[in-house]
């Protein structure tokens, strides 16, 4: 079974547990932290993926590092360690977030702008683009990109809505280049 299929199964099982115990938000937040640590700490990955380190030592390391995690997240990580699949934690996290977003009718969006946007500026963007995306709400993360010149660019999943000045200039350039052929 491929890694993504495996991570989907574990994510689905963890999602069911979190949903039944009304801990969806908490489990999602914990998984995001765990994913960041797994991605940023090469030494941790080396230990978790080393075949000569016993599973009990790996679990002890996780327990000491992430002792405050909910039992369902800890047990999932322990199960992954037992099955030599600790490396799929980042994928599992992404799949869990997708399932949680579907359940909440929410989607994640990135708004690129020339300057940081205030909450008052992001609220109408969230409302307008939630309708375009066909979801109840958007969780917006703002990233500053000075090369936009002005305006904004919104990325929701694999869709991009480009209302930036640089994007408009590029479209005009393509049109003019097409007419001059």
UniProtKB/Swiss-Prot annotation:
PROSITE patterns from the UniProt entry: ATPASE_DELTA
Gene Ontology biological-process entries: proton motive force-driven ATP synthesis
Annotated membrane topology: Peripheral membrane protein
Location of this chain's protein in the cell: Cell membrane; Membrane raft
InterPro entries the UniProt entry points to: ATP_synth_OSCP/delta_N_sf (IPR026015), ATPase_OSCP/d_CS (IPR020781), ATPase_OSCP/dsu (IPR000711)
Keyword line: ATP synthesis, Cell membrane, CF(1), Hydrogen ion transport, Ion transport, Membrane, Transport
Gene3D superfamilies (alphabetical): N-terminal domain of the delta subunit of the F1F0-ATP synthase
Listed GO CC annotations: membrane raft; plasma membrane; proton-transporting ATP synthase complex
One example GO MF annotation: proton-transporting ATP synthase activity, rotational mechanism
Superkingdom of the source species: Bacteria
Listed Pfam families: OSCP
UniProt similarity note: Belongs to the ATPase delta chain family.
Functional note: F(1)F(0) ATP synthase produces ATP from ADP in the presence of a proton or sodium gradient. F-type ATPases consist of two structural domains, F(1) containing the extramembraneous catalytic core and F(0) containing the membrane proton channel, linked together by a central stalk and a peripheral stalk. During catalysis, ATP synthesis in the catalytic domain of F(1) is coupled via a rotary mechanism of the central stalk subunits to proton translocation.
NCBIfam families tied to this protein: ATP_synt_delta (TIGR01145), PRK05758.2-4 (NF004403)
Subunit structure: F-type ATPases have 2 components, F(1) - the catalytic core - and F(0) - the membrane proton channel. F(1) has five subunits: alpha(3), beta(3), gamma(1), delta(1), epsilon(1). F(0) has three main subunits: a(1), b(2) and c(10-14). The alpha and beta chains form an alternating ring which encloses part of the gamma chain. F(1) is attached to F(0) by a central stalk formed by the gamma and epsilon chains, while a peripheral stalk is formed by the delta and b chains. The F(1)F(0) complex interacts with SpoIIIJ and YqjG; YqgA is found in the same complex. Interacts with FloT.
Name of the protein described by the UniProt record: ATP synthase subunit delta
Organism: Bacillus subtilis (strain 168)
Name of encoding gene: atpH
């Amino acid at each position: 079974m491929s890694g993504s299929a495996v991570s989907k199964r574990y994510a689905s099982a963890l999602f069911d547990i979190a949903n039944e115990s009304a801990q969806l938000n908490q489990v999602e937040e914990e998984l995001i932290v765990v994913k960041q640590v797994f991605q940023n700490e090469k030494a941790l990955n080396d230990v978790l993926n080393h075949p000569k380190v016993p599973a009990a030592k790996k679990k002890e390391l996780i327990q000491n590092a992430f002792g405050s995690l909910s039992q369902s997240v800890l047990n999932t990580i322990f199960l992954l360690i037992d099955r030599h699949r600790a490396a799929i934690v980042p994928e599992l996290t992404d799949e869990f977030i997708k399932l949680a977003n579907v359940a909440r009718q929410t989607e994640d969006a990135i708004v690129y702008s020339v300057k940081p946007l205030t909450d008052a500026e992001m609220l109408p963007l969230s409302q307008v683009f939630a309708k375009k995306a066909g979801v109840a709400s958007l969780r917006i993360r703002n990233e500053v990109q000075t090369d936009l010149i002005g305006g904004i660019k919104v990325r929701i999943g694999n869709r991009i809505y480009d209302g930036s000045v640089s994007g408009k200039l590029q479209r005009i350039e393509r049109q003019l280049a097409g007419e001059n052929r």
